[in-house]
């Protein structure tokens, strides 16, 4: 099974140089089989996993391909069968079990059980861990979050309230005990992971320090606890494509009706849990990473690029080049409990286009992008629940262009909301042109933010009002605010409606040069159509 092919160069034995003919090596399920095959592989080899479950986590640190197919699963979880005892002092239906090793993630019937961080929650109050285990969140109880668990470090014990207060000893519980990804790329140029199901990990795939030109493609990634795919530590020129990424929570993570009761799902994880769970995260990533043609659903955030430690203009930006030249395109991102796509940090030369965001709570969210330029175009935002394009946390001084997008549903097309401490800068370098906006509150809404409305907006077609400059007729002079726009099922506007030929030619918008995606001759009629589609 394992092939060692040394190259003789003069009198030197080189164990790591690629052979003239890379090997195609079959690997069958066995304890540690993938790790052993990786250790023995030569650069350029393909490790072809035969169908079955591989119960391990692995690190790829050679330029090899790990190739799966239908029925190939990497799943490091193991049964969790401690000695459960009723914890009557906490509440009916709550059980306790002493453990030698802390579970990092707990699964019930293969789905992730919501975890409370006892350190964050404290013991008392409606959101104290004892109250949550006994009664659930204060408004909905266990209606939307059917099970809750947590680890007590002082007692070295796990507490669990299972669905319907069942005895955990009768349930199919599994765990992972390591806080690592199922597959990690480290110190490697040109490795690939293709066609593998990544299931029941603390994290799915980590593309980290020293990883360059690696590929994660055609994989089913989930369930996972913290992050589906992460690109971090300066990893550059990597591609994440054609994957299905979903967290696999026991509770329903679709945005739902926006009620305060359902909002408690977000509160439990963000306030007393372990914060965001992100489908694809680029955190302090390097240059020119690409995220494309993926289906990301039922996560908190879909795809993020930025750095949560610099989400205020009061904080310095020590690494403005993080995430430079990131491309996020042609993804389907839907039913997210929080943002569909988030952009922050330096955001230099970031391109977001061709994506469909459907029923996302946070839509396309800007978290203090500082520099730019950011190009956001030809996206479809459908059914925002409630946000679409959303400036949050603080003013956004970056230069940005938002054009040829179709926005349907939700409250307003563009909003200021949730500024923690605005700095009276606003968004002076942002341009909104040639967009089609069909929403309840029209183009712009401001949710109690004291920041100047100073972006440029023009040549948009809008249903619902919401003019950004109602007292200045000279601004936004060419936009059309109309009563109705007929849309096809795919949200293309009617060929006889007001969106047709309503835009401005963007092939010369940048000092005579085109905006990305708008080369000379890119439209069919007398002028471009507003929105993501060129109809007529």
Task: Describe each PLM feature range.
Residues 183-192, 210-215, 231-241, 277-290, ...:
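Surface-exposed loop/turn motifs in large extracellular/passenger domains
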Residues 43, 48, 54, 60, ...:
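Repetitive beta-strand solenoid architecture
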Residues 56-57, 61-65, 351-368, 372-492, ...:
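Predominantly extracellular beta-rich ligand-binding scaffolds that present long acidic/polar faces
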Residues 83-94, 176-183, 200-203, 223-232, ...:
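Extracellular beta-strand/beta-solenoid scaffold signature
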